[in-house]
Regions:
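Short acidic/glycine-rich loops and adjacent helix/strand connectors
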Residues: 6-204
Length: 204
């Protein structure tokens, strides 16, 4: 995130991912990870959507952040949910923390966060980056070009056209939990007869 935020001096950044499955935080100092943890390890609630005091306190024991980096644009996500007949999305738990209230915050698009996580932790100086998931704010598929310290979007596709949601639907169809057990479904695929339903799925 130090590269993403354009920081060249020593800085401590708290990266936060929540209000979705598997909430997590990461604390970085000058781009080096000091702490990273999932909320579920502290709350004992599988796939916990929210951070909690124990997790945040543990992260802050490694240093006080100069800035908070949030993994999506909440107002865009809220707009998408409302336009689809929902109620607007949840409030992140970390906003309840008085000690984080005045820390400068910066949000990044959901798919940019995916792209950055893959590219900036790789050993490549340039790369084509493909993001496929269920849904970000609106994006479901995106292609990026990484060059040096820069990432720029090339092409995007928006909800409801989503390979990730399509895959999760099949995960649920075979009796597994969507947004959790897709990896089991993927592993099972190697033992099945792919031709059995291929034409039906292709027609869809």
């Amino acid at each position: 995130y130090s590269r993403v935020l354009g920081k060249t001096t020593m800085s401590i950044i708290l990266g936060i991912n929540e209000t979705t499955h598997d909430a997590s935080v990461t604390l970085l100092k000058d781009g080096k990870i000091l702490f990273a943890g999932h909320a579920e390890r502290f709350s004992k609630q599988k796939n916990d959507w929210y951070t909690n005091d124990e997790l945040i306190d543990h992260a802050l024991s490694y240093g006080e952040p100069d800035r908070i980096a949030y993994y999506e644009h909440r107002w865009l996500k809220k707009a998408r949910i409302i336009t689809r007949g929902g109620f607007g999305g949840e409030k992140p738990y970390y906003l309840n923390r008085a000690d984080l209230k005045w820390v400068p915050r910066e949000s990044f698009s959901h798919h940019y966060s995916h792209a950055a996580a893959g590219y900036y932790t790789s050993k490549f100086d340039d790369a084509v980056i493909v993001v496929l998931d269920a849904i970000g704010e609106f994006n479901t598929t995106s292609i990026w070009i990484g060059e040096g310290s820069n990432i720029k979007p090339v092409k995007k596709r928006n909800y409801p056209f989503s390979f990730g949601l399509f895959y999760s639907a099949f995960t649920q169809l075979v009796g597994l939990r969507p947004n959790e057990e897709e990896y089991i479904f993927m592993g099972m695929a190697a033992y099945g007869d792919w031709t059995r339903y291929y034409l039906k799925v292709k027609e869809y």
